[in-house]
Amino acid sequence: MQTYTYVSKGKFELMEKPKPVLMDERDAIVKVTLASICPSDLHIKHGSVPRAVPGITVGHEMVGIVEDIGSAVTNVKPGDRVTVNVETFCGECFFCRHGYVNNCTDQNGGWALGCRIDGGQAEYVRVPFADQGLNKIPDHVTDRQALLVGDVLATGFWAARISEIKEEDTVLIIGAGPTGICTLLCVMLKNPKRIIVCERDEGRIRFIHEHYPEILTVSPEACADYVRANSDHGGADVVLEVAGAESTFRLAWECARPNAVVTVVALYDKAQTLPLPDMYGKNLTFKTGGVDGCNCEEILRLIAEGRLNTEPLITHTYPLDRIEEAYTLFENKMDGVIKVAIEW
């Protein structure tokens, strides 16, 4: 089968590999029908993910059709259309039982697909712990509508959930890339008083204005003053940092009012510093919002009800044999790209 594979630092390659087979009674084999490219794939390409193993097929955002299941799998059957969770998790350890599946302690737990084991930018993928990692797609939900459920949409949903958003709040979201927009959609479900999105890219600002005209937008340079002028208590009640730069990390806590919640959703290429003398007295609560894929069934229900729609984010579609073009487009943010779908 065709796969897109991490060969060495800076190099992915389209190559043939054997079709995966069941290796455990809890596995499933999924025929991939649609996949996407994530910034995390780019981190692997450039050597920023030490756990990533050269020779691994990349890709962790995908949907498909179950082809085969192990003897212990009960939640899905061959022929089911499914989303695939970016995380594999056992469902039995302390963290899984308490809903923190991102911290699963099994050796295959956490982010394995497309990082430590072969992922889904391929014709087929083996999914460990299939009962936890696969969710059936409702009949009237399309593959494109469900494509982002297992990663960036689950990330945004978890981040919004842990941020304690109330209807009287002013919420600031820093960053309007794919994860930032998914976070925005999930924050909108909480119906806060106002939402401000901070973004520098004019194309992404236009996207926000076109699709979500009720949302306020501001550039990073004007953000602090704008938030103070458009909030009730001298700053945002909740800040979600989804951009992942040193400057945006600082901007997040600077724009927060005293006693606010600051949720860090982004990944950073290097460690960040909390300048505690500058922050003293703000009494901020910091949370981290890394993807926790325990809510995928609820997210699919919201999509089926018409309350969540990420299809507009899929701005470009390529076949697998042109995936290198798709990566070039996505990495260089060309032609107004938000998300790219890879189809078979």
Task: Report residues per predicted region.
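Conserved acidic E/D residue at the C-terminus of a beta-strand in Rossmann-like folds
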Residues: 199, 266, 290
